């Protein structure tokens, strides 16, 4: 894979602008955990997302699970509900090779780097309630981009990756 082709933060901003997608950006220090992000002054804390990049035990299927920042996903329960093989966190190498991301910067916008459309996205349905906003990293963990949840779903679908909205 040619890493020069991967979209970085500025390229994500340019893409959103070119697609006429409303977004708001909050620049902040690099954050690697939800606890660190809690120390940052963000405008829509209720819309902040936590992302888990997982694969099955055979590394045949990859999933990006996007949930509310204050929630926890039980991977065993998730597996049962979605009829997957046993799940585990994907390796740092897989994260870089497939999504072009480093740990701490996992985001649904990384799907734009998934050239083979390997990753299936699962999105928490609560992001479609209230303001219907979602806050995700722009492929780097030094900012949060706030988008309309429907726009994010459309970005993923238009790229060719499957996305399911469900209660996690």
Predicted regions and their residues:
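Extended, low-hydrophobicity, polar/charged segments
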Residues: 2-168
């Amino acid at each position: 894979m040619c890493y020069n082709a991967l979209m970085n933060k500025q390229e994500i901003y340019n893409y959103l602008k070119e697609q006429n997608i409303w977004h708001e950006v909050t620049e902040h220090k690099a954050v690697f955990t939800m606890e660190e992000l809690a120390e940052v002054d963000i405008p829509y804390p209720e819309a902040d997302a936590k992302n888990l990049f997982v694969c099955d035990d055979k590394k045949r299927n990859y999933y990006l699970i996007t949930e509310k920042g204050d929630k926890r996903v039980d991977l065993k329960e998730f597996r049962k509900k979605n009829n997957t093989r046993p799940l585990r966190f994907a390796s740092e190498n897989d994260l870089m090779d497939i999504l072009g991301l480093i740990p701490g910067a996992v985001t649904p916008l990384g799907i734009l780097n998934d050239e083979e459309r390997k990753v299936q996205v699962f999105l928490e349905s609560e992001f479609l309630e209230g303001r219907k906003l979602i806050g995700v990293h722009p492929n780097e963990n030094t900012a949060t981009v706030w988008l309309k949840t429907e726009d994010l779903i459309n970005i993923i679908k238009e790229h060719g990756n499957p996305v399911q909205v469900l209660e996690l």
